[in-house]
Amino acid sequence: MTIDTTEVDALINAPGRCVVNSSLESLVELISHLSSCGFEQLTDIFGIDYLEREKRIEVVYLLLDLKRNRRCCVKVSVDPASEKVPTCCGVFSVANWFEREVYDMYGVVFEGHPDLRRILTDYEFEGFPMLKDFPLTGYKEVRYDLESKEVVYEKVDLSQDYRSFDSLTPWKGVGRPSDPFDGRKE
């Protein structure tokens, strides 16, 4: 198996730990290769919203090699409005649930997923609640109406259109959260 090194950037930041930045095109091949190299357990897939980036969502895959006590973090950046992430369900079946959660919270579409639908929020939920520009109150209020004996959805009056995340503070680390899997120094 040959992985195009122009599409993968790796960093070993501690003994037994590595971070790999991948392109969308190489992702499934890379995950499959790592699986055949002993990383037999996919422990999590999650998203991080970097509002200021062009490709604002970073999808992170955490792989574990129990025999050699190694961990590998694979990252791929995506613009959920225009790009789809290839599913890894063919390599790790547990990816099914993790990918559904990332879709539900961040709106990232996983191409080829066998059952991509919401898993944590209501099926009529609008938007993706973990995005930094999602309103704190949501778009609709859901409540049970005793008179009609049914669930009622009511539009919420948004008093705050947009939250600004720029912070002029002297405190270290407030402007940019630290990422234990990031090899860059502050």
Curated annotation (Swiss-Prot):
It catalyses: a quinone + NADH + 5 H(+)(in) = a quinol + NAD(+) + 4 H(+)(out). It is a peripheral membrane protein. GO terms for cellular component: plasma membrane. Residues 166-186 are annotated as: Disordered. It is found in: Cell inner membrane. Its EC number is 7.1.1.-. InterPro entries: NADH_DH_suC, NADH_quin_OxRdtase_su_C/D-like, NADH_UbQ_OxRdtase_30kDa_su, NADH_UbQ_OxRdtase_CS. Keywords: Cell inner membrane, Cell membrane, Membrane, NAD, Quinone, Translocase, Transport, Ubiquinone. PROSITE patterns: COMPLEX1_30K. Pfam families: Complex1_30kDa. It is an enzyme of class 7 (translocase). One of its GO terms (molecular function) is NADH:ubiquinone reductase (non-electrogenic) activity. HAMAP family: NDH1_NuoC (MF_01357). NDH-1 shuttles electrons from NADH, via FMN and iron-sulfur (Fe-S) centers, to quinones in the respiratory chain. The immediate electron acceptor for the enzyme in this species is believed to be ubiquinone. Couples the redox reaction to proton translocation (for every two electrons transferred, four hydrogen ions are translocated across the cytoplasmic membrane), and thus conserves the redox energy in a proton gradient. NDH-1 is composed of 14 different subunits. Subunits NuoB, C, D, E, F, and G constitute the peripheral sector of the complex. This is NADH-quinone oxidoreductase subunit C. It comes from Neorickettsia sennetsu (strain ATCC VR-367 / Miyayama).
